[in-house]
Amino acid sequence: MQESLLNSLCARRFAIHARWDTLLRTERVTSPLAYPDALVHLIEWALDQIFTLLRDPTVRKRAEHAGGRGTARPVCPCGRSPLLAFFLAGEQALLEALVLEQAAHLPIDPSERDAALGELYYVVRTLARREVDAFCAVCQHRHDGENGGAHHGHEVVHAAGPAPEEAHKAEVVATKPA
């Protein structure tokens, strides 16, 4: 990312923070830790990390190699990580700021525009994956998805068997004459 564009993004830090906060409050809450009031204090830390990574000269090469926008978002087996919504809101806020900043400096070279976008996606998603993976490593539900249960914030059905109501229905059906 060009230094001037990065400096302009840094100058928008307050607006990015405010937008991130707003977007975070529109996300679905998947657990008590995912309440926006529990997460907003992480925004400044995350912005520090993101701007530091964007200034790292090796990031451009890694982003180009990774395909930038093709960099995968983090995955949480049980879907309960509060950081999924946190980083999704942050990615959106940063993307909006980048697009507004680029539009303010038209005309812009399409390859530079795409490179900046790729670097932003790469940095945000790499940081998000690192933090989600760390959270998932200590999560009590991290193996729920491996048992064939539901994912992505839905109630997990454990391999131990059906819920008591379902077990009772199955018993009633099994005892009815054919």
Protein language model annotation of sequence segments:
Residues 4-5, 62-178:
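Long, amphipathic alpha-helical coupling/dimerization segments that relay conformational signals between
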Residues 1-82:
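N-terminal low-complexity or simple alpha-helical regulatory segments
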